[in-house]
Curated annotation (Swiss-Prot):
Protein name: Teichoic acids export ATP-binding protein TagH
Enzyme's top EC category: translocase
Main location per the UniProt record: membrane
Keywords, alphabetical: ATP-binding, Cell membrane, Membrane, Nucleotide-binding, Translocase, Transport
Listed NCBIfam families: PRK13546.1
Catalytic activity: ATP + H2O + teichoic acidSide 1 = ADP + phosphate + teichoic acidSide 2
A single Gene Ontology CC term: plasma membrane
Binding site for ATP: 60-67
Lineage: Bacteria, Bacillati, Bacillota, Bacilli, Bacillales
Topology with respect to the bilayer: Peripheral membrane protein
Length: 335
């Protein structure tokens, strides 16, 4: 193509452990790898390059791995296997990603820009433009936990496009909101394209992807099914969707079940992750992290109920303590 590679996925796979209950998540931290629970491969051996200035669409049915790819691209989660190379600063636009519910819209803008390394003077200059673009009125001074999904998307999009990223990853952010805001977003995307920015566009809307993208990657149950020119791949995907929708419900359920069972099967070939050690937790790290989470939740319970620590423990059975100690898989069960 003659352009520099901006994003490279090399044999990338992402594995999640499947647990029967919440307490098993903590137990899994201390189990040997050979005794781990059943796994689910959200991505399996995915490889592609995205070049400087390209706009590439990611399409596929629910659970195909689109959002997993966008999260790995943006550094939200690491891959389990394979290598990811990102040449530039990435900004992920998805509904409520990185926004803090208790903070107001105004406070979230300031926090996000501070995290991008901006000085207070720079933030003050950008603030009016971001608020105007988001166009959420007086809600800018309200906690975003009270926002609708459309309002959160507006604010997230407005912040991200004003950070001037090299790579813009848009994950279903245009699926909410009215037509006026959608057109405003499309104009901004086209402006970014004219400036030679690299854009990854994740959407269920085939019309949006065809109109905005140069190439399309069609994900299907964690694997790449087709990749190529936008019109060609979009036509094949459209034909598949029409065919699938015509099938009886029993066949649809069987089809999806078979593919999900395939995603639970062990990876046949292992590709090393060069950065794996950066994400691996030692046994001591796991112990400290688990203890911190349990104590934090217990303390929060004490504050909420007004009980003493001794009184709480006397009323809490071992099973209840295990129920309290809930850890999210994405955050600490990474291998």
């Amino acid at each position: 193509m003659g352009k520099n590679i901006k994003i490279a996925f090399k044999h990338v796979s992402k594995e999640y452990d499947l647990y029967q209950n919440k307490s098993d998540k903590i137990k899994g931290l201390f189990m040997p790898k050979s005794q781990k629970m059943q796994s689910f491969w959200a991505l399996r051996d995915v490889s592609f390059d995205i070049h400087d200035g390209e706009t590439v669409g990611l399409i596929g049915i629910n659970g195909s791995g689109k959002s997993t790819i966008s999260s790995i691209m943006s550094g939200v989660i690491p891959p389990t296997q394979g290598e990811v190379v990102i040449n530039g600063e990435t900004s992920l636009i998805a509904i409520a990603v990185g926004l803090k519910g208790p903070l107001t819209g105004y406070e979230n803008i300031r926090l996000k820009l501070l995290m991008h390394g901006m000085k207070s003077s720079q933030i003050n200059k950008l603030m009016p433009s971001i608020i105007e673009f988001a166009d959420i009125g007086d809600f800018i001074n309200q906690p975003i936990k009270n926002y609708s999904s459309g309002m959160r998307s507006r604010l997230g999009f407005a912040i991200s496009v004003h950070t001037n990223p090299d790579i813009l990853v848009i994950d279903e952010a245009l699926s909410v909101g009215d037509q006026t805001f959608y057109e405003k977003c499309v104009n901004k995307i086209n402006e970014f394209k004219a400036r030679g920015k690299t854009i990854v566009f994740v959407s269920h809307s085939l019309g949006q992807v065809k109109s905005l993208c140069d190439r399309i990657i069609w994900m299907h149950h964690g694997e790449i099914r087709e990749m190529g020119e936008a019109k060609e791949v979009a036509q094949k995907y459209d034909e598949f969707v029409k065919w699938f929708n015509k099938q009886p419900n029993d066949y649809k359920k069987k089809y999806q079940k078979e593919h999900k069972e395939h995603q639970k099967a062990p990876q046949k070939k292992v590709y090393p992750n060069p950065n794996a050690n950066k994400y691996r937790l030692t046994l001591f790290d796991k112990f400290l992290l688990t203890a911190l989470i349990v104590l934090t939740i217990l303390f929060g319970t004490l504050v909420a109920t007004g009980k003493s620590f001794k009184g709480l423990i006397s009323e809490t059975s071992t099973n209840q303590v295990e129920q309290i100690a809930y850890v999210d898989n994405n955050e600490i069960t990474i291998r």
